[in-house]
Every structure is written in C-alpha cells, then in structure tokens.
Amino acid sequence: MQDRLISGTEKPEDHFDRAIRPTSLADYIGQPVVREQMEIFIGAARGRGEALDHTLIFGPPGLGKTTLANIIAREMGGNLKSTSGPVLERAGDLAAMLTNLEEGDVLFIDEIHRLSPVIEEILYPAMEDYQLDIMIGEGPAARSIKLDLPPFTLVAATTRAGLLTSPLRDRFGIVQRLEFYSVEDLTHIVSRSANLMDVPITVEGAEEVARRSRGTPRIANRLLRRVRDYAQVKGTGEVNHEMAQRALDMLNVDKAGLDTLDRRYLSMLLERFDGGPAGVEALAAAMAEDSGTLEDVIEPYLIQQGYVMRTARGRIATNQSYLQFGMTPPEPKN
C-alpha cells in the first residue's frame, strides 16, 4: 500500500506528537462519553484505594488509544509499562514484565489481538487473581508454581476487537470504543497543538485542517506540520484559511478528507463494480491491495462518513459517493 499522509497508522514522524499529547482527563479533548465514564471509574478506584479494572480500548488507528492509556496511568498514580502483542513472543517475555510490576502500575499492551494463545493463557490468572503460573523444569520432573502479583491494571488497545477471543475479551471490566472526532473537537486539538508548536494559526485555519483530518487527531497533527511548512515557505508563517486550503490541495487531501487511495477505492466500486454489491476480496484484487488494508485502513472512514455501506452481499456505494464524483445516483430498485 502506498504511504498515506492521511493514514491513521503511526509513522516515525508522529513520535513528535508525544510532546503535545494531553496528560490528564481534564486536558483530553473529545470522546465525551469515554471521558466522563473514565473520570467516574478512575475516581471510584482511587477512592477505594484499588487498582482500576482491566480496560480494553478499541477503535480505528490514530484516535488516541495510547494517549488514553498514558492518562489512565497518570490519573491512577502508577507507572506505565508498554509493550505490544507481536513483541510478546515467548511466555518468558510476558512473565518478565508482570513480575516487574509494582502495585498500581498499568501494563499497556497495544495490538492485543495479535497475542499468541500461549501468552493469553498466562494472562488469564494474572488478570483474574493477580497470579502468575510458572513451569519449573522439563519433562516428568516439571512442576508448576504460583507467584503472587501486585494489584495492577491491564490496559489493552486494538483496532480489531472482533479478533479477540471471548475468554480474553470477557476478562476486561471496562470496554471503551473511541469514535471519530467532530470537526469542532479537532479544531480545538489543532489550535492546542499549534500553540504548543509556536505556530500562529487562525480559527479558520485550524478549522480547515480539522475538516480534512478524517476525524482523527493523529492525522490532524500530521497535516498541521505540513501546512506549517507551506505557510513558512509560501507565506508569512501564519496558518490562515487560505494557507491551509492551498497547502492541503497541494497534498491531494480534498475538502472531504479523501486522498488518492480513497478516491481510487470509490472509483473502482462505482465504475468497475457498478456501485456494488462487491465483495472485499474482489475489491482488494482489483486494487492490488490486501483485503485487511481495505477493512482496517480505507473503509472505516468511508463507511462512517456514509460513502459506502457494508452488507452481507458486499460493499455498496451510496448516493453520496456518486455525488462526490459528479455522477447521477441510480434510481432506487423496486
């Protein structure tokens, strides 16, 4: 898949965002339902002097799952120990992390849907009973010993909650889904980031960046950096509406936040498959892309914005897709 400026997946350049991430729920912009619930859950756990229930955070990439995990650790007054599903290859890898936890710490596992079954089996007693089962020795002489673990909170993140096994999913007391952000919330995020980056920006400039950011803070901050560069070279350095518009047009990010790959997907669905229904495998083959890329990277935003419907028979283009390409929507079928 081509490198996408508006991809929600983290890139090396996005590591800069860590310096401008909010560090408390009070500074956390957007996701009002999640924020209110976590304020209550964290406040109650702190009041009882207990570890927060294990928490699963899921949603499309770039919406702030890692940021929320960091905030949870800070609000609970514990240390954050981070890892990811693909990194935990051996039982010893997870055992080492668990035995190094202190009371109240938060263990963050990103991409938890990629854990192996062996690692999951170790997690079950650790999550339920704060115990770690370890095998000592090999063969007939092998024996199992139990180690007590301090009360801790497992915070897990995934873009594909449906791939979690039921036994693992059922062990999370708190499950939060992050939704795409509104233009209003993203405008506040862009303004806040610009202020921290010492970039002069108008409300209209911030709103234009927000409108084309696909409801995703990571993309908004990435576009802001590129617009800043454009304004510095082509203007006075201030990001106003005109500067943002010209910069984003140059970057092939249109007013709807769609890029070349989005338009190619919609064009393929409309023209090659007559608007659908089309199976994801057929679409992926026609685009020479992986079906997982379509499902995880391209389709979530297009579906959320009403360009595509996902049905049992396949993907169907909506009237909005036809209008986006200046085409006349088909007459409804009787």
UniProtKB/Swiss-Prot annotation:
Residues engaged in binding ATP: I20, R21, G62, K65, T66, T67, E128, D129, Y130, R171, Y181, R218
GO cellular component assignments: cytoplasm; Holliday junction resolvase complex
Enzyme class: hydrolase
Known catalytic reactions: ATP + H2O = ADP + phosphate + H(+)
Residue span of region Head domain (RuvB-H): 255-334
Keyword Transit peptide carried by entry: no
Keywords, ordered alphabetically: ATP-binding, Cytoplasm, DNA damage, DNA recombination, DNA repair, DNA-binding, Hydrolase, Nucleotide-binding
Binding annotation for DNA: R310, R315
EC number from the UniProt entry: 3.6.4.-
Domain statement: Has 3 domains, the large (RuvB-L) and small ATPase (RuvB-S) domains and the C-terminal head (RuvB-H) domain. The head domain binds DNA, while the ATPase domains jointly bind ATP, ADP or are empty depending on the state of the subunit in the translocation cycle. During a single DNA translocation step the structure of each domain remains the same, but their relative positions change.
Biological function: The RuvA-RuvB-RuvC complex processes Holliday junction (HJ) DNA during genetic recombination and DNA repair, while the RuvA-RuvB complex plays an important role in the rescue of blocked DNA replication forks via replication fork reversal (RFR). RuvA specifically binds to HJ cruciform DNA, conferring on it an open structure. The RuvB hexamer acts as an ATP-dependent pump, pulling dsDNA into and through the RuvAB complex. RuvB forms 2 homohexamers on either side of HJ DNA bound by 1 or 2 RuvA tetramers; 4 subunits per hexamer contact DNA at a time.
Subunit structure: Homohexamer. Forms an RuvA(8)-RuvB(12)-Holliday junction (HJ) complex. HJ DNA is sandwiched between 2 RuvA tetramers; dsDNA enters through RuvA and exits via RuvB. An RuvB hexamer assembles on each DNA strand where it exits the tetramer. Each RuvB hexamer is contacted by two RuvA subunits (via domain III) on 2 adjacent RuvB subunits; this complex drives branch migration. In the full resolvosome a probable DNA-RuvA(4)-RuvB(12)-RuvC(2) complex forms which resolves the HJ.
Protein name per Swiss-Prot or TrEMBL: Holliday junction branch migration complex subunit RuvB
Chain's gene name: ruvB
